[in-house]
Amino acid sequence: MKIFYILFILGLWSCTAASQTVVSVDAKQIINEGYIGNGAQWDPYQLDYGKGRLNISEADWKKMYDRLDFMRPQFIRVMTNTTSVMQDGVLYPERGLEHLSHILDYCQSRDVTVMFGDWRGVMVDARKEVIREKNLSAAAEYVRFLIEEKGYSCIKYYNLVNEPNGYWSSTDGKYSLWARAIRFFYGELQKNKLAGKLSVVGPDAAIWTADEAWWVDIFATHLKDEIGLYDIHTYPSKITVNSGEYTDIIRAYKQAVPAGRKIVMGEIGFKFVEPADSVYQRENLRRAAAKPYASMDDSQMFVYDFMYGTDMADALFQTVNAGYSGSVVWMLDDAMHAKEAPDKLKVWGFWNIFGEEYFGTEEEEVRPWFYAWSL
């Protein structure tokens, strides 16, 4: 009986020992000097969802300001289409400013670093493989106007063409075409005496594996003078992050960045692309189909769940530990973008500011993952 008792105690001890996790903190090692910060994508809103134009009330702007003050973002990405403020080839920079200014005013008043840019804005013609110099010049003049004439010194970085490595991009994945556009645009910034005030960002590549790291490598080789900040976009699967594989993937891009330069995550979110996450993807599609205003093609319906917050925190910690200097989450507000139709929103946000006015009062409430990202 005594032997049995001893074995029983040893068994309990071994189970307890096996379950212990040792966490060590190295307070002396610096992972990243001069961290830019974390924040969110905050673009000018679509406003027309198929039944006439809506306007964001001052009360709703205040509501967003108050929520952002709780979050305390340090880094905001703002993307526009320069051609939306052009007519017959002429730039009208004041057009739409009453809307854009609310976003930039917040960032300027809170000392938030802004990555401004152009989604594509017919800056290139992939079929003819030519750059559109007139539009590129207009983009350079537009950002000069915002910085010099309107005083938005919070704009520190410029992102020309979203995800140029993708077949969905206006560049159709053609590196040489995009590189020519970057060189020309940088020359226009120099003409406008902005080269010392505004840094160009790139390659802005969307990645799921380490296979696209050559974009950073070739970028660092051919455009080292033009580029002031490196960035990529990641939409990993849940299993990729939870397993820790995500760190290995994004580290490949950090290692391709020249010494002394920084790289940030220009967009980050989750997509259930791996077979191991197929159950989540089926549920994601089921939820999107059940919600009248959700895009079936481009929505993350788990933003309503606490799980999404813990997963995003996991991804952020791995990104920081891999040596990145900031992360911009996709995205702040559902009401910014639609996909298949004007009322089929990309549901990815912390909320939908037009919930009470149009999409359902409950949609305007803050979702759980906002708090995880705010920590």
Role assignments for model-derived ranges:
Residues I3-W13:
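Sec-dependent N-terminal signal peptides
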Residues C15-K62, D66, M71-Q74:
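Mature N-terminal, pre-catalytic/accessory segment of carbohydrate-active enzymes
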Residues G50-I56, D88-Y92, K128-V130, S170-G173, ...:
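Short, flexible/disordered intra-domain loops and linkers
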Residues A59, K63, E98-H102, K134-E141, ...:
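Extracytoplasmic/secreted proteins, especially bacterial periplasmic and envelope-associated proteins
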Residues L68-T240:
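Substrate-binding cleft and catalytic face of glycoside hydrolase catalytic domains
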Residues K134, D204-H233, K271-P292, A335-K344:
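Substrate-binding cleft/loops of secretory-pathway carbohydrate-active enzymes
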Residues S237-S295, A315:
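Glycoside hydrolase catalytic-domain groove-lining segments
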Residues V273-L375:
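Aromatic/acidic polysaccharide-binding cleft in carbohydrate-active enzymes
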